[in-house]
């Protein structure tokens, strides 16, 4: 499916990109997860899909993990909170039930080339993207060369 936020010089704001990402989830029959009242973890994860131009295929999710680890500013404690969400635990449980842990190992092995390309690209970044971004950052164009962070 064509996603405008994956274009090189996309004119969308981050907020518009996230809306397009949620529409994409609906189009492929998946429900967009919603944050709890006092959390923004899911919103911030969805934003990384838009910022780094990734969809939700298993390979792209594996690549997004690498973008996040090497291309974002974050705190491990905060990221562990994402892994503890019931929806994410259920997703991992379903994946390992269908293919076992071997499926995840094969997936990451298959994606090693992609992961190395991402690591090289993150080394050329002048600023890491803040995983916990301020709300006003969602109004800035994704391709803006000088981001105020």
What are the residue ranges of the model-derived segments?
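Single conserved hydrophobic/aromatic residue that forms the stacking wall/gate
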Residues: 140-149
């Amino acid at each position: 499916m064509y996603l405008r936020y994956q274009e090189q010089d996309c004119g969308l704001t981050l907020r518009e990109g996230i809306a397009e990402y949620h529409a994409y989830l609906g189009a492929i029959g998946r429900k967009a997860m919603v944050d709890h009242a006092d959390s923004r973890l899911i919103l911030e994860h969805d934003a990384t899909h838009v910022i780094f131009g990734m969809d939700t295929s298993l390979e792209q999710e594996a690549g997004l993990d690498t973008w996040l680890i090497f291309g974002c500013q974050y705190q491990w404690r905060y990221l562990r909170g994402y892994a503890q969400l019931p929806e994410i635990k259920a997703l991992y449980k379903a994946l390992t039930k269908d293919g076992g842990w071997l499926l995840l190992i094969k997936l990451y092995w298959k994606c090693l080339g992609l992961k190395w390309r991402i690591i090289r690209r993150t080394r050329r970044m002048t600023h890491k993207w803040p995983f916990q971004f301020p709300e006003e950052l969602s109004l800035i164009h994704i391709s803006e060369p000088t981001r105020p962070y």
